[in-house]
């Protein structure tokens, strides 16, 4: 018989991937499975004041949703509040309607706000709920918050749980043991542990917590959770069944895994090198997750940016400012299929046009133009340095590489053969907020080196009415940049090939031949 309680936080922590939207069938399958498994509490999501950012059903946990789950669940239920965005005067709206529906309110707390959090906790406790005090940034407590642990006696008689949160996923069993001893010296409140899996230590840290006699541990189905995720519920239960004889219905456990597998296949949470680096160096999961899920950033660039941060440097390289040569005609080459389809005509146009330069927003088609004897400018953002190396060999390279302004968020990568002919722009003048955009860098480069016509090819747009999330994001970004160009110059950008972007003015290349 286990002498500790298990929180399953799948819907709350997993919501960081789904924006807290879960299909009703998945939730019902989850609740039914949890009813048959040795789980004590289900953490269903957040209660929040209205925010500008979208949060789905389990980001707000409407009362009607909680009532439905209360009716079908045999487990204790809890929801979480963020202390930083919750004041005592909000509680009548946020949690008073939950009396008799949920059993515990857990509050996410930054140690620096401990005193303020105690006031909030007392107000919550007075409403009759069990209270969980979830304190973040555990790996920094002894270094960054030296007085924090000494204050824990203030929650005696208030909190029913003091949960230690390894926010960065970098704790070791030895460090965990040290902190548990310090915590127990300072409070009589039952202690819990919520781990993250950046260094694949979620299981061993949780087992260490159990061996140390902690009262609560957290887990999630398939480890679903922010960034690198959490300890897998199925892994913990399998171990406890084998080692402690805790009864587990593995058919039910398999069913809930099956229910969440499509979400895993879609979002692919779990640790990988960027999360490992962030865990080992206590870098916030939120920041790394935003990088890993961003279409523009290569794996190498994320690792490089994290390494720069670890080394406390702004960027790993700095280059001279791009000189503003002035060409009468500049052609920006994008990544669509039209440069391939109209290659001969584009080359003919270039050959008959005087004072012309090519700016490659992406190196995808760069190899097609190495035989054209005009200046080439290659924009290097994200994965483009690697793409350039793949498409243009050292013996064929005759151009200039262009980088965004210094310092670059994720560091700098330049092909070895281009080191001597690499420059950076001083600033992004025609738009704001797109420092990591290939198209933004290409347009600014064209403005810097051109004095007349600026054309594009390869900005075809995506056909069809149903676009992927990546295509929608890229389309919206590109539209914004074309509109910003028009505001900056007073005229639309001209496309020499057909395009679905209404922000472009199409002038068929064939009229010039």
Sequence positions of predicted segments:
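Catalytic cores and adjacent flexible loops of soluble metabolic enzymes
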Residues: 1-328
């Amino acid at each position: 018989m286990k002498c500790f309680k298990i929180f399953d936080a799948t819907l709350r922590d997993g919501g960081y991937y789904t924006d807290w939207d879960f299909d009703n069938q998945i939730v019902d399958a989850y609740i039914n499975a949890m009813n048959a498994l040795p789980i004590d509490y289900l953490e269903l999501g957040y209660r929040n004041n209205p925010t500008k950012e979208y949060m789905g059903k389990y980001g707000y946990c409407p009362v009607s949703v909680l009532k439905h789950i209360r009716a079908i669940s045999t487990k204790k239920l809890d929801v979480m509040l963020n202390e930083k965005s919750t004041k005592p005067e909000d509680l009548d709206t946020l949690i008073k309607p939950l009396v008799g529906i949920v059993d515990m309110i857990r509050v996410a707390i930054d140690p620096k706000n401990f005193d303020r959090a105690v006031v909030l906790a007392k107000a919550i406790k007075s409403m009759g709920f069990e209270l969980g005090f979830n304190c973040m940034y555990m790996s920094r407590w002894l270094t960054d918050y030296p007085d924090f642990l000494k204050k824990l006696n203030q929650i005696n008689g208030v909190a029913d749980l003091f949960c230690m949160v390894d926010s960065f996923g970098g704790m070791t069993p030895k460090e965990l043991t040290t902190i548990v001893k310090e915590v127990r010296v300072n409070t009589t409140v039952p202690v819990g542990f919520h781990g993250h899996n950046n260094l694949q230590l979620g299981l061993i840290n949780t087992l260490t917590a159990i061996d140390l006699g902690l009262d609560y541990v957290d887990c999630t189905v398939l480890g679903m959770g922010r960034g690198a995720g959490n300890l897998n519920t199925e892994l913990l239960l399998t171990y406890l069944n084998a080692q402690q004889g805790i009864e587990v219905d593995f058919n039910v456990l398999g069913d809930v895994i099956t229910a969440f597998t499509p979400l895993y296949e879609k979002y692919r949470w779990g640790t990988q090198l960027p999360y490992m680096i962030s865990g080992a160096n206590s870098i916030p999961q939120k920041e790394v997750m935003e990088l890993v899920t961003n279409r523009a950033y290569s794996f190498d660039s994320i690792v490089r940016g994290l390494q720069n941060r670890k080394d406390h440097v702004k960027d790993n390289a700095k280059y001279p400012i791009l000189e503003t040569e002035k060409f009468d005609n500049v052609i920006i080459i994008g990544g669509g299929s039209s440069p391939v389809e109209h290659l001969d005509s584009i080359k003919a146009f270039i050959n008959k046009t005087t004072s012309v330069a090519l700016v490659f927003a992406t190196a995808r088609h760069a190899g097609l133009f190495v035989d054209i004897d005009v200046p080439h400018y290659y924009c290097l953002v994200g994965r483009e340095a690697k793409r350039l190396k793949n498409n243009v060999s050292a013996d064929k390279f005759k151009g200039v590489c262009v980088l965004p302004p210094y310092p670059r968020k994720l560091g700098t990568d330049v092909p070895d053969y281009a080191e001597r002919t690499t420059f950076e722009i001083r600033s992004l003048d025609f738009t704001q907020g797109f420092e990591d955009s290939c198209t933004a860098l290409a347009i600014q480069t064209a403005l810097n080196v051109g004095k007349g016509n600026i054309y594009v090819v390869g900005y075809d747009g995506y056909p069809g009415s149903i676009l992927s999330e990546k295509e929608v994001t890229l389309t919206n970004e590109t539209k914004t940049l074309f509109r910003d160009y028009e505001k900056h110059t007073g005229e639309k950008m001209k496309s020499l090939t057909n395009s679905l972007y209404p922000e472009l003015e199409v002038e068929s290349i064939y009229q010039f031949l």
